[in-house]
Amino acid sequence: DTTDWEKFEKWAETVPYTFRNPLYHWTHLELKTAFGINKILNPQTAREIYDECNEKLSQPEYSARGMMRRYHVEVVCTTDDPIDSLEYHIKTRESGFEIKMLPTWRPDKAMAVEVPADFRSYVEKLAEVSGVTISNFDDMIAALRKRHDFFAEQGCRLSDHGIEEFYAEDYTDAEIKAIFNKVYGGTELTKEEILKFKSAMLVIFGEKIGRASCRER
């Protein structure tokens, strides 16, 4: 619960220690290209740079839309969960804004079966937003397919997956359905079951959901 200035001040204290790290160069590249500031950020210059940036950010040309126009951005793709409403994508399009803002499909939480309570909570939200009653694995896939179709209608053509390790376990449909029932019922899965479920979901996203939606368009 700190102020914006306090956060910026701490970053200014940290920047000198990032020398030879990309963070050092990125920080000063952004200050120079976006704000025209050539000063080195450190504790001594922090307040001056902070005030100058904020003064410029109050101007229309430094708004989010103004900055995108300056850099000739044509398309912005956001990272979105299947249960996201995409309401701001719709509002932006309806406002007549010339730069396209499109969603991307990021279904990590639909694969996150490590904590049964969290997974069940997510599936319940998925059921609510999709209008599909979910009581088994096939129901969940139907709900995800419905959401994927909605994303496609809003211009989504890209998928983004946060894969922290490689997995391509062999599995059967019966195993995956049983694993879903187990975790949805509140029982923790084994490491092998987790990997099998994630492997199955990647295949399903690529073959049964993504490819089908693209083919229909």
Task: List PLM regions with ranges.
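Metal-cofactor-binding active-site regions of metalloenzymes
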Residues: 1-207
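Residue-level detector of conserved catalytic or cofactor/ligand-binding positions
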Residues: 209-216
